[in-house]
Amino acid sequence: MVAKPDLGCRGAGVQLVRDAGKLRSYLSAFPRGARLLLQALVPFEGEAGIFYCRRPGESKGRIISITLKYFPHVYGDGRRTLRQLILDDPRAGRLAHLYLGRHADRLDDVPAPGDAVRLAFAGSHSRGAIFRNGNAMVTPAMEARFDTIAQSLPEFYFGRFDIRFADFAQVQAGQSFTIVEANGAGAESTHIWDRRTTLVQAWGDLMRQYRLLFQIGRANRDRGFRPLSLSEFRRWHRREKELTPLYPATD
């Protein structure tokens, strides 16, 4: 299974739990009084972030962002140890402080030629995952499927579904994927982290996202919903900042 904090971001505290001993270790390291989630492990290698938006009163919503995520790997050559492969890799070497500890029990192993060693479990760019802009891959069937899912959630108008899948063509057909997270108003259109995106493009996409968010917020206020007060927002923000350094190490 997968263990993760209920309150957090960028993959903080996410761990793969393979046995009862690992679960006990995770629970003992978790901050007291904080909530956590235990999820069934989804074995699919593919991961994507699907950002959905619908204004209150609209009959259907749309997908405004797709991010394809690729996990960091090194590949064996039959000569170098895993430690050497990590340190010699132009990208992984810069994040060796993350990977060496996670793979401490196998750093002296020599992977066979062509063997892929996945370096991180969490699909976060802070863990070395590569993000690619997939906005051109939206299909009507995919949009209809996510609209059905979003409209089944009471008052869900804006957010990112993080999914796992085996074949993205099936996702485009609206089939064969598993949602591992639903992120709400604090979510980000993560396609902006594609290295081919310019700073101006990233700013523009974020401003369009936040314009939609504030339009939805205004519509919901007009419908009678009370927004968080500034003090409430600060309290939640402070709580997240206090908890994040206390979570167990991220896989």
Regions found by a protein language model. Name each.
Residues 50, 66, 163, 182-184:
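A structural signal for short, well-ordered beta-strand segments
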Residues 86-173, 220-247:
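A long amphipathic alpha-helix within ATP-dependent nucleotide-binding catalytic cores
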